[in-house]
């Protein structure tokens, strides 16, 4: 039995029916990892011994349910007690936390089994995993292409069948963009819906914990577990967390769906525009009302983001100085040189670039011209979304302007690389929930459709995504590693 092909809820059913054990699942997945990991390069750290021990312990209890006995992966910026957390950086290459992130702790308490920590762009700053200090991950649909970023290791592992789901973070599209490139589902909840405690911070007003999985039902199931108020995270929201799975079978008939003209411009490839418009017609067939709208300030989201996010990163990363933890240069003659040399050796070029951008934007004489202006743009973007949501239930757009690009193709073209997040960044700037689901293939590569919802209305978002999924077969397409598809 190819257990690696199954979703979380399918594994649940087989565990409850007594057809398989948790140990069977874990062994099957590690066999799969042994087969494809040399190409995928998705994992930074594997936890085979502890995963097998955990599975056997759960099997002895002979009591399954929820995610009990089901394996998962973590983007390697979630702190894991006793397990290395590197952020894909030389700065934290040997850092072993003494505490567990809230989100992973909630999964562990429900019986989830951690298989390993997954690759990312260093400190989540990138769109391809090529900024990892260790190695780039690869796209299972074509090993010569990127899986996206910064959560590319998570997306590659899920798409390749190495894990059924993963937790990751999304600051400007870091869950949705790789989900689109790898043909899986990627959910970024509303800002504050899930605790960020124990997750290494990039941009604190934009970061959000989310999920990568093979289908929408799995996202709904996992979100119910990890969502909610956390006393350790002041930015987590004290709002009701519904049973998201209960909403999935609702009708979309009469639902009002908007598509913004600004998200279908010439810099989005024609094949992707065509694919998403075809997907919108599927919603119309299901009884939804689809209309064009305008989000006029979204075109300014990317430049504003690259002021706000680096500004916050420059303050968040100031803590890495070689004193309490992280890489330390022992050759320095004084403490100032030690700070400077430790950071020079510990941080990669993209992280340094963003620290310098952020420090400049916050510096005396430039704060008003850059940071303050960017925050004003951010408010205008949020206002545009609010106006549309007065009359519509959902907004639909492409997730990315192109399909996955080749490794090395954009590494020296920073502006083009940043443009990969042009359609996802506005959602983070407004703090809204967004999900990417597969909606087509373009020359054998997955195309993602992005659904955007009202704040804290993930239920409607998931219902619409599930309706599309149940009336199409794109989520059932899986890659034959290296090229081609299994239908």
Swiss-Prot record:
<dbReference type="InterPro" id="IPR023631">
    <property type="entry name" value="Amidase_dom"/>
</dbReference>
<protein>
    <recommendedName>
        <fullName>Glutamyl-tRNA(Gln) amidotransferase subunit A</fullName>
        <ecNumber>6.3.5.7</ecNumber>
    </recommendedName>
</protein>
<feature type="active site" description="Acyl-ester intermediate">
    <location>
        <position position="174"/>
    </location>
</feature>
<comment type="similarity">
    <text>Belongs to the amidase family. GatA subfamily.</text>
</comment>
<comment type="subunit">
    <text>Heterotrimer of A, B and C subunits.</text>
</comment>
<dbReference type="InterPro" id="IPR000120">
    <property type="entry name" value="Amidase"/>
</dbReference>
<dbReference type="Pfam" id="PF01425">
    <property type="entry name" value="Amidase"/>
</dbReference>
<dbReference type="GO" id="GO:0006412">
    <property type="term" value="P:translation"/>
</dbReference>
<keyword id="KW-0547">Nucleotide-binding</keyword>
<dbReference type="GO" id="GO:0030956">
    <property type="term" value="C:glutamyl-tRNA(Gln) amidotransferase complex"/>
</dbReference>
<dbReference type="InterPro" id="IPR004412">
    <property type="entry name" value="GatA"/>
</dbReference>
<dbReference type="GO" id="GO:0005524">
    <property type="term" value="F:ATP binding"/>
</dbReference>
<keyword id="KW-0067">ATP-binding</keyword>
<keyword id="KW-0436">Ligase</keyword>
<feature type="active site" description="Charge relay system">
    <location>
        <position position="150"/>
    </location>
</feature>
<dbReference type="InterPro" id="IPR020556">
    <property type="entry name" value="Amidase_CS"/>
</dbReference>
<dbReference type="GO" id="GO:0050567">
    <property type="term" value="F:glutaminyl-tRNA synthase (glutamine-hydrolyzing) activity"/>
</dbReference>
<feature type="active site" description="Charge relay system">
    <location>
        <position position="75"/>
    </location>
</feature>
<comment type="function">
    <text>Allows the formation of correctly charged Gln-tRNA(Gln) through the transamidation of misacylated Glu-tRNA(Gln) in organisms which lack glutaminyl-tRNA synthetase. The reaction takes place in the presence of glutamine and ATP through an activated gamma-phospho-Glu-tRNA(Gln).</text>
</comment>
<dbReference type="InterPro" id="IPR036928">
    <property type="entry name" value="AS_sf"/>
</dbReference>
<keyword id="KW-0648">Protein biosynthesis</keyword>
